[in-house]
């Protein structure tokens, strides 16, 4: 981890890959110096109606720590080669995000690579509901398996495709494994 002194409120997880193989040979997690202010504002706006401990100017260490862990995990995901997954935003039904049983088991999103930072759907009467994302979502675990699990019976990278495609086929109709790429807008 490195801290960058800048007025910008952000973080990033750049990596460098070998162009011949795609192997990631270097990664970094960068926290911009105003990340605490950004996380405070996001969490306050998205959860203060249901979480009294965020209704103050400075969060306690546990509250801010959970937000920093989310950002660190998201940026580490980038260093591992994971892209943003905006398909996760619409994977969970609204009533599930208001359920303590569901959110305690699955968290607030199936992918930390989405920008679903906090459970802003929760209402004051939703007691025990999770307000923060899991350390890793079910999609993230699957994506890491897909990218990194050795396929020992494959003689070449070409031979791995059947197994990789089979894994995708097994999850294609499960909404927790939706993938939605980040849209990019190019100048005209």
PLM regions: where:
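Generic structural "secondary-structure junction" signal
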Residues: 3, 19, 31, 84, ...
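Catalytic Zn2+-binding segment of zinc metalloproteases
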Residues: 76-92
């Amino acid at each position: 981890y490195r801290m960058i002194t800048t007025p910008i409120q952000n973080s990033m997880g750049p990596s460098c890959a070998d162009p011949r193989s795609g192997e990631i040979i270097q990664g970094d997690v960068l926290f911009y110096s105003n990340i605490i202010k950004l996380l405070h504002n996001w969490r306050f706006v998205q959860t203060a109606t249901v979480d009294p401990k965020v209704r103050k100017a400075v969060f306690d260490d546990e509250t801010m720590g959970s937000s920093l862990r989310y950002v660190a995990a998201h940026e580490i995901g980038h260093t591992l080669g994971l892209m943003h997954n905006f398909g996760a935003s619409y994977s969970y039904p609204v009533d599930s995000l208001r359920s303590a049983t569901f959110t305690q088991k699955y968290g607030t999103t199936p992918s930390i690579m989405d920008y679903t930072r906090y459970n802003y759907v929760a209402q004051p009467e939703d007691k025990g509901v999770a307000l923060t994302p899991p350390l890793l979502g079910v999609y993230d675990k699957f994506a890491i398996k897909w990218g990194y699990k050795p396929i020992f019976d494959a003689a070449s990278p070409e031979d791995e495709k059947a197994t990789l495609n089979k894994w995708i086929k097994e999850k294609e109709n499960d909404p927790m494994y939706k993938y939605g790429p980040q849209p990019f807008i190019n100048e005209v």
